[in-house]
């Protein structure tokens, strides 16, 4: 059986939670009132609750929802992690269906491919840009420099 867990990690769930902590700290440092696990009713005519990784409390004046993705190029060949990018596409759909008035942020890990000469976030925008709602911001976290840039 092949193990698709990231090398050096306890589990992929731990990786995701650790990355959410980084995103949470980033937005708190910027002065935003951010909480974890924000539930919103999403959908067209029929609605269903969806839990976003981070966001502002429901009664906040400035409304923000954030989804965090710490995916990397598939190792060792820097192949496209196609299955993982379908999760990014699903996130775009949830952002599209979210209530109006929310600032929508996809917070991703910067992973640069020398083979492709671009980050996974840049690749996603280039390849799937037609699926990204115009009001979604994609922010890329560089774990080496501990910095964030808007793509």
Residue ranges and their predicted role:
Residues 30, 57, 97-101, 131:
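Alpha-helix C-cap/termination motif
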Residues 14, 18, 103, 123-151:
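Charged, structured surface patches that assemble and position nucleic-acid processing machinery
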Residues 14, 18, 22, 49, ...:
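Short, well-structured alpha-helical interface segments that form or flank functional binding sites
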Residues 68-127:
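Catalytic cores of nucleic-acid endonucleases
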Residues 1-42:
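Acidic-basic catalytic patches of nuclease active cores, encompassing PD-(D/E)XK
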Residues 52-70:
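Active-site beta-strand-loop-beta-strand hairpin of nuclease catalytic cores
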Residues 38-56:
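N-terminal interaction modules that seed assembly of large macromolecular complexes
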Residues 38-40, 107-112, 140-144:
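Acidic carboxylate-rich catalytic motifs and surrounding loops in phosphoryl-/glycosyl-chemistry enzymes
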């Amino acid at each position: 059986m092949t193990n698709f867990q990231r090398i050096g990690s306890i589990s992929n769930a731990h990786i995701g939670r650790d990355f959410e902590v980084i995103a949470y700290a980033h937005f708190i440092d910027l002065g935003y009132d951010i909480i974890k696990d924000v539930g919103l009713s999403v959908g067209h005519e029929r609605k269903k609750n969806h839990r976003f990784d981070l966001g502002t409390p429901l009664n906040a004046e400035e409304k923000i929802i954030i989804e965090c993705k710490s995916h990397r190029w598939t190792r060792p060949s820097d192949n496209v992690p196609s299955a993982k990018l379908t999760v990014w596409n699903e996130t775009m759909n949830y952002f599209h269906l979210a209530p109006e008035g929310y600032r929508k942020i996809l917070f991703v890990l910067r992973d640069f491919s020398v083979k492709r000469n671009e980050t996974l976030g840049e690749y996603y925008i280039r390849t799937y840009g037609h699926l990204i709602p115009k009001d979604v911001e994609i922010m890329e976290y560089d774990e080496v420099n501990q910095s964030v840039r808007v793509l």
